[in-house]
C-alpha cells in the first residue's frame, strides 16, 4: 500500500476508534476492572479476594476472575495510577453497576491499555516480517473488524495474549537469523510466551515448539524450554495455594480448557502437531519458515478444537495477519475466520447488543439476550467448516512449498474497515424488540420458609453453556428437596434431601449447551424452617421471577407484562449521552490521533523484509 493510502487507512481507523473507545463496552470490562481493584483495596492475592465476592462465580457457573495474574495486576496498577491522579474514583466503586464506573470518561480511561496493546501489536506484526510485507500485516491487524469489535469496543483482553504471542514470534525469528545473540533473543521469545500464558493459557503450548526450533543444540533446546516453563511457573506460583485460581484462573473454561473435546483427544491432537513440528525442524531450508508454519499451525489446531468464546478469534487473526503477507494461500482462511468470529458474536449471548448500546442507553439492558432473535446455526457450522478447511489447505500448501510469495492487496484493509459499520448495522437490526417479561430493579429479600413451603425462582440464562446455579441460605442451613427444570419441563437435577449450608449453595448441572435465552426454574422445599434468597445477579441476569407457594414474591417479575424498546428511544438516549460527553470524545480523538500517529511512524519506516 502506497504512503497516501496507508496514511488514509490510519486516519479512518483512528477516527472510528476515537468514537467507539469511550462509547461502547461489554460487561466483562466492568467486572474485570472492578475485581482488579480488590488487589489494592482488599488483599494482594486477587484470587483469594475475588473468591469472597458475589462476583466470584455467577449463577451460570462462570467466573468473575477467569484470567491469569498478568492481566489483573497490570490492570490494578493502571487503576491505582488513575485513582491517584483523580481521573477515576476506583476505591469508591460500589460494584460493577456503579454509575461512575460505567461513565464514558471512565470507560475511555479503562480502555487505554487495550488501545496501547492494539497499536503495539501492529508495530510488532510489522517488524516481524519487515518491509512492505510487514506493513501489509499491520494493516490486516489494524483494519480487522473482529479485532476492533472485541479489543476496542467490548474491551476484551485477548489482544494482550495476541501481543505476547506475536512478540515471541518476532524474537524467535530474529534468534534464528543471527549467528550471535541467538540464545538471548530465544530466551526473550520464551519469556513472551510465558507472559501470554499468564494471561490466557494457550501460549504455554508453544514453549516446546519454539524451544525445539530455535535451539541449535539439545542443551540449548532444554534451556529455552526451562526458561519458558520456569518463567510461567514463577508468575503463577504465589497463587497455586488458592483453589479458586486452579478452578477458574488456570484451568477454567474461560482461561484455559475451552475445548469441547475430552482431554485425551486434545492431548492426542497436540502430540500429532508436535510430531509435525519435529519433522518441520529437520527439513532442509529456512528454519524461520518452519517456525512461522508451526506458529500458524498451532493456532489452526486451537481453532479446530472449538468450544472457545468468539473473542478468542483475536489470537487466530493475529497469527493469520502475519501469515497472509508471507503466503497468499492464508488469505482465504483469514477472511473466513474473521467472518466466523463476527457471526459467532451475533449468536453468543447478544454480545453486540451489550457492546453497542450499554454505555449509551439503559434500555438495551432490559432486553434479555437472544430470546426473540434467531440463531444462525447452519451458517455458523458451515462457516466454521469452511474456515478449518481453508486453514488446513493453506498449511498443507505451505508445507509442500516453503518460501515467500505473498501478494499485496492494497484495497483489502480499506474493505475490511468498511465492513465494520455494515456489520454493526446488521447486528443492531437483530436486537430483540420485546418479550413477555418485566425486569425487577432490586433483588427480592430473603424468604423465610417453613417446613412444607415451596420456594422457586425462574431466570433466563445469558450463557450458552449452563454448568451450575447458585443460591444463598441465611445462617442456620438445613435439609431441603431441591430440583432444577428447564423451560421445556425437563428435570436437570433433583436431590430429595440435600443438606443446605449457610452461604452459597451451588447446584451442579449436567452439561447444558445452547442455554442462552432459555428459562430455568429452581425449586426448594425445606424439611424445616430456613431462609433462602437468590444470588444478587449481574445486569444481564436482572430479569427473573420468584414465587412462594405459587404466589409471586414482591420485587420480582411475574413474566406477564410486554416490554418493547423503540429505535427512537435508543438513538435518543445515545445522542443525549454523546452531547453531554463531548469533552470525552475530544479527549478520545486527541489520544487516538497521537497513538495512531506514533504507530504510523514506526510501521511506515520499517526496514526491508526479513527472510522469515
Please describe what each predicted stretch is:
Residues 3-169, 173-178, 211-298, 345-391, ...:
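Primarily membrane-embedded glycan-assembly and transfer machineries that use lipid-linked glycans
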Residues 164, 205, 309-327, 382-391, ...:
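Hydrophobic/aromatic-rich transmembrane helices and adjacent perimembrane loops
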Residues 285-302, 333-336, 559, 610-612:
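Transmembrane alpha-helix segments characteristic
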Residues 157-159, 190-212, 301-313:
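Transmembrane helices and adjacent periplasmic/lumenal helix-loop junctions
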Residues 593-612:
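Juxtamembrane interface at the cytosolic side of transmembrane helices
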Residues 404-417, 421-488, 499-506, 510-517, ...:
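Beta-sheet-rich sandwich/jelly-roll-like modules and their strand-loop junctions
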Amino acid at each position: 500500500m502506497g504512503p497516501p493510502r496507508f496514511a488514509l487507512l490510519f486516519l479512518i481507523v483512528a477516527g472510528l476508534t476515537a468514537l467507539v473507545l469511550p462509547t461502547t463496552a461489554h460487561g466483562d470490562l466492568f467486572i474485570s476492572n472492578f475485581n482488579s481493584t480488590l488487589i489494592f483495596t482488599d488483599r494482594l492475592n486477587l484470587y483469594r479476594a475475588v473468591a469472597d465476592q458475589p462476583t466470584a462465580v455467577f449463577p451460570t457457573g462462570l467466573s468473575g476472575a477467569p484470567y491469569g495474574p498478568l492481566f489483573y495486576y497490570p490492570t490494578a496498577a493502571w487503576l491505582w495510577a488513575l485513582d491517584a491522579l483523580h481521573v477515576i474514583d476506583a476505591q469508591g466503586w460500589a460494584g460493577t453497576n456503579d454509575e461512575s464506573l460505567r461513565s464514558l470518561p471512565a470507560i475511555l480511561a479503562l480502555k487505554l491499555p487495550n488501545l496501547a496493546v492494539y497499536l503495539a501489536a501492529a508495530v510488532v506484526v510489522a517488524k516481524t516480517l519487515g518491509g512492505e510485507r510487514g506493513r501489509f500485516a499491520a494493516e490486516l491487524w489494524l483494519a480487522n473488524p473482529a479485532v476492533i469489535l472485541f479489543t476496542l469496543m467490548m474491551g476484551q483482553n485477548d489482544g494482550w495474549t495476541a501481543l505476547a504471542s506475536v512478540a515471541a514470534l518476532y524474537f524467535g525469528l530474529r534468534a534464528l537469523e543471527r549467528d550471535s545473540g541467538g540464545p538471548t533473543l530465544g530466551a526473550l521469545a520464551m519469556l513472551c510466551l510465558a507472559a501470554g500464558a499468564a494471561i490466557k493459557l494457550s501460549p504455554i503450548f508453544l514453549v516446546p515448539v519454539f524451544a525445539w526450533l530455535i535451539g541449535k543444540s539439545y542443551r540449548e533446546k532444554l534451556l529455552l524450554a526451562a526458561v519458558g516453563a520456569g518463567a510461567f511457573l514463577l508468575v503463577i506460583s504465589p497463587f497455586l495455594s488458592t483453589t479458586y485460581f486452579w478452578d477458574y484462573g488456570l484451568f477454567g473454561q474461560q482461561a484455559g480448557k475451552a475445548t469441547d473435546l475430552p482431554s485425551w483427544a486434545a492431548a492426542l491432537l497436540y502430540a500429532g502437531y508436535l510430531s509435525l513440528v519435529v519433522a518441520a525442524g529437520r527439513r532442509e531450508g529456512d528454519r524461520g519458515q518452519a517456525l512461522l508454519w508451526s506458529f500458524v499451525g498451532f493456532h489452526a489446531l486451537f481453532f479446530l478444537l472449538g468450544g472457545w468464546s468468539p473473542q478468542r478469534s483475536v489470537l487466530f487473526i493475529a497469527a493469520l495477519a502475519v501469515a497472509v503477507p508471507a503466503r497468499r494461500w492464508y488469505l482465504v482462511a483469514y477472511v473466513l475466520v474473521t467472518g466466523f468470529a463476527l457471526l459467532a458474536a451475533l449468536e453468543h449471548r447478544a454480545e453486540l447488543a451489550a457492546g453497542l448500546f450499554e454505555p449509551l442507553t439503559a434500555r438495551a439492558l432490559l432486553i434479555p439476550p437472544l430470546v426473540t432473535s434467531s440463531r444462525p446455526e447452519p451458517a455458523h457450522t458451515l462457516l466454521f467448516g469452511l474456515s478449518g478447511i481453508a486453514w488446513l489447505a493453506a498449511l498443507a500448501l505451505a508445507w509442500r512449498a516453503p518460501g515467500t510469495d505473498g501478494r499485496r492487496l492494497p484495497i483489502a484493509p480499506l474493505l475490511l474497515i468498511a465492513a465494520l459499520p455494515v456489520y454493526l448495522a446488521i447486528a443492531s437490526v437483530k436486537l430483540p424488540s420485546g418479550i413477555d417479561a418485566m425486569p425487577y430493579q432490586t433483588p427480592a429479600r430473603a424468604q423465610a420458609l417453613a417446613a412444607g413451603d415451596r420456594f422457586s425462582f425462574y431466570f433466563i440464562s445469558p450463557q450458552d453453556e449452563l454448568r451450575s446455579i447458585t443460591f444463598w441460605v441465611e445462617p442456620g442451613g438445613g435439609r431441603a428437596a431441591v430440583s432444577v427444570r428447564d423451560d421445556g419441563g425437563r428435570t436437570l437435577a433433583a436431590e430429595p434431601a440435600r443438606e443446605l449450608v449457610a452461604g452459597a449453595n451451588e447446584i451442579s448441572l449436567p452439561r447444558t449447551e445452547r442455554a442462552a435465552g432459555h428459562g430455568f426454574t429452581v425449586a426448594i422445599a425445606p424439611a424445616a424452617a430456613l431462609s433462602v434468597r437468590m444470588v444478587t445477579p449481574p445486569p444481564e441476569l436482572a430479569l427473573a421471577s420468584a414465587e412462594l407457594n405459587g404466589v409471586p414474591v414482591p420485587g420480582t417479575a411475574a413474566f406477564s407484562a410486554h416490554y418493547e424498546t423503540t429505535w427512537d428511544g435508543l438513538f435518543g438516549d445515545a445522542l443525549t449521552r454523546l452531547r453531554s460527553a463531548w469533552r470525552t470524545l475530544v479527549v478520545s480523538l486527541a489520544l487516538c490521533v497521537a497513538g495512531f500517529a506514533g504507530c504510523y511512524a514506526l510501521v511506515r519506516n520499517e526496514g526491508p523484509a526479513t527472510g522469515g
